Amino acid sequence: GKTEVSQFKENETKVQSDYVLTYTNSFDNGNHNLTATAGFTTYYNSLSRLDGARKQGVGLVIPNDPDKWFVSIGDAATATNGSTQWERSTLSMLARVIYNYKGKYLFNGSFRRDGSSAFSYTGNEWQNFFSLGGGWLMSEEEFMKDIKWLDMLKIKASYGTLGNQNLDKAYPAEPLLSNAYSAVFGKPSIIYPGYQLAYLPNPNLRWEKVEAWEAGFETNLLRNRLHFEGVYYMKNTKDLLAEVPGISGTIPGIGNLGQIQNKGVEMAVTWRDQIGEWGYSVSANLTTIKNEVKSLVQEGYSIIAGDKQQSYTMAGYPIGYFYGYKVEGVYQSQADIDASPKNTLATVTPGDLKFADVDGNGEITPEDRTMIGNPTPKVTYGFSLGVNYKNWSLGIDMM
């Protein structure tokens, strides 16, 4: 029989500190209103983990001492171990100003400087980000006062930059060494342990940056019972942080691979009313999105994923688009097979799928694979219904 001993310990620490100073004031009889904020934040995250296992014959007594449970006694092939330890931290300095004139001309601006330990080994740990926004409450203008059914109309626009440092690697610029391999040299042959990088390091690794802007409006109508909002947005993700799959047995790498663009329209409408002690609301929303990879590391480069290479990412196409054979229909008869381009992939019979000859060479070959689908939905929408009576409420959401 076998005796087994296992031990698992994990200790994770997360500490966040925020130090913020805010100044608020109004000038010129309340015509000018200002709020200014400045400060800095820190974030620290660490993890320490210890694994262990032991199987050994009943005749070999395991000392009742945790420090000796994993000493290499007995059959070494049955002993396992493992350990994980890492820490990461960020420091951010920030400032923000919010201003309005007479409550109808609106402005806000922010700036932050972020530093991340993830890029400290490449010298790119610091990056600046900012945002600007403005709005015009048109319904407060004198020339809009006579429109009785219009309660509020606001035009708004904004532009900003954000950063991303998140990867599933604690030290993305410093890969771990794995000793899962060995080499044999000499006569007599001697086995030497070998070490391999978990992934190729990148000395130029840096922050992923997102540039986003949007413009739109929102309005309340019919005594604030009807609310409508519409926005056009565009988001460009640059210096995309991603892992490059290994090719032909090579190990993967990590880098800033390129640029991705998302753009579209967001719309939402809500009708809300009160009848006595009963209230109800009906809402709907719709979002369109066009996703496109604008560039990768170099022209013609592609990222292939999936056990059958069915997911492709390359410039000019949606990210992770489905790659395969386009189906034209089903072979109806042997005569249909004989009259169609020859399928060199397999022997086909009536009832099998008929693939398109994309390259037009008269044969169905692997070169006929093309984009056959987009994993990113072009349109998403949802509905919600709500009813309330006194202190009771019921809501239904559908997407």
Task: List each model region and its residues.
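Extracellular/periplasmic, surface-exposed regions of secreted and cell-surface proteins
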Residues: 1-315, 384, 390
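Active-site loop/lid in soluble adenylation, ligation, and acyl-transfer enzymes
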Residues: 20-22, 372, 378
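C-terminal beta-signal and adjacent terminal beta-strands/loops
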Residues: 148, 290-292, 320, 332, ...
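Solvent-exposed beta-strand/coil patches in large extracellular/periplasmic or lumenal scaffold regions
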Residues: 202, 354-357, 374
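Conserved C-terminal beta-signal and adjacent last beta-strands/turns
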Residues: 281, 374-399
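Glycine-centered loop/turn motifs
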Residues: 308-320, 343-356
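C-terminal segments of large proteins
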Residues: 325-326, 330-334
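Acidic carboxylate motifs that coordinate Ca2+ or other divalent cations, activating on Asp/Glu
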Residues: 361
